[in-house]
Amino acid sequence: MTVYTPTSERQAPATTHRQMWALGDYAAIAEELLAPLGPILVSTSGIRRGDRVLDVAAGSGNVSIPAAMAGAHVTASDLTPELLRRAQARAAAAGLELGWREANAEALPFSAGEFDAVLSTIGVMFAPRHQRTADELARVCRRGGKISTLNWTPEGFYGKLLSTIRPYRPTLPAGAPHEVWWGSEDYVSGLFRDHVSDIRTRRGSLTVDRFGCPDECRDYFKNFYGPAINAYRSIADSPECVATLDAEITELCREYLCDGVMQWEYLIFTARKC
């Protein structure tokens, strides 16, 4: 794996961000619950054999692997080496060859116009500087190429979960915009307005039948999801705060859990680089 070292300007926030995503086991969440989202974005983006594809904030490979299976030449990049190693293992098990790059979405180590398609599923939304991230995705995409993202909506379960834990997360940079804004049609379109044409958006939902009760759902995120673990660690010395956050997440899970099934809403954004 080629390792990219961020500049000193970005080192501190990038390091903190990387450490948060290494908490728990996000790869397990991605593979157990979120895996269907990758093929959806690959199909929506019209990825074809021979396309040069960059998966930004690739995590454990939910987009990279199906794109490679479609015959694309794929480079998977992520800030967290632990997740990239998991993706490498999955790709190797499937007999696929991909390029791997440890990289910050806000400062991608690639040339302008290097890729035919730049994709991200539940990834770039977590980079603290949204406009800089969008500018980078556009920069490395060739003219006429496709930029596609899939992100949680503010109104859906996952968006509300992120809003619930956000006040308890100490590692968020001051003034950082909310990650769920990437799931708003107007907001994400505005981020790319100077770079793209043929903007299209559509909403969908991921069906999740993993949890038997609200408490099980809460504990799953509490034990495996890095941002939630980060939030709980920040209030570990306050039983009252822990109880409050427990109750808030439990109630949210109860709201969306119906006969053992949940629907998690997402937004797909696609556009052509000008």
Curated annotation (Swiss-Prot):
Superkingdom of this protein's organism: Bacteria
Query: Mind telling me which Gene3D superfamilies this protein's record contains?
Result: Vaccinia Virus protein VP39
Tell me the keywords, alphabetical order. Answer: Signal
| GO molecular function, a single term | methyltransferase activity
Q: Extract the CDD domains matched here.
A: AdoMet_MTases (cd02440)
What does UniProt give as the signal peptide span? 1-30
Tell me if Signal is a UniProt keyword of this record.
Answer: yes
| UniProt similarity note | To M.tuberculosis Rv1405c.
Descriptive protein name: Uncharacterized protein Mb1438c
